[in-house]
């Protein structure tokens, strides 16, 4: 089972709000998911990002692949750097 960390769209029309979820890559964007890792609100100024760092690192270490947008959000929070350091044994 290929697992991805991606955004699930929530909120009203023209007012998106996203949950960062771990889901099977074959399930639809807003369909079934395994676990919620955090939230992302691009409408708020500045954009509001809340991520459970321990959960995100756990899923990255078990092989979940983040989408491009989630990778950028993780990088801005410093999670990708911690993941790469842990992977290389630093």
Swiss-Prot record:
SUPFAM superfamilies from the UniProt entry: Ribosomal protein S16
Disulfide topology: none
UniProt superkingdom: Bacteria
Keyword terms: Ribonucleoprotein, Ribosomal protein
InterPro entries per record: Ribosomal_bS16 (IPR000307), Ribosomal_bS16_CS (IPR020592), Ribosomal_bS16_dom_sf (IPR023803)
Any one GO cellular component localisation term in the record: cytoplasm
Single Gene Ontology BP annotation: translation
GO MF terms held by the record: structural constituent of ribosome
Protein family: Belongs to the bacterial ribosomal protein bS16 family.
Subunit structure: Part of the 30S ribosomal subunit.
Name by which UniProt lists this protein: Small ribosomal subunit protein bS16
Encoding gene per record: rpsP
């Amino acid at each position: 089972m290929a697992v991805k960390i991606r955004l699930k769209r929530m909120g009203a029309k023209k007012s998106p709000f996203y949950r960062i979820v771990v889901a099977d890559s074959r399930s639809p964007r807003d369909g079934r998911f395994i676990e919620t890792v955090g939230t992302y609100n691009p409408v708020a100024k500045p954009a509001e990002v809340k991520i459970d760092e321990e959960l995100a690192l756990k899923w990255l270490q078990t092989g979940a692949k983040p989408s491009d947008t989630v990778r950028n959000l993780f990088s801005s929070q410093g999670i990708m750097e911690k993941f790469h350091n842990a992977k290389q044994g630093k």
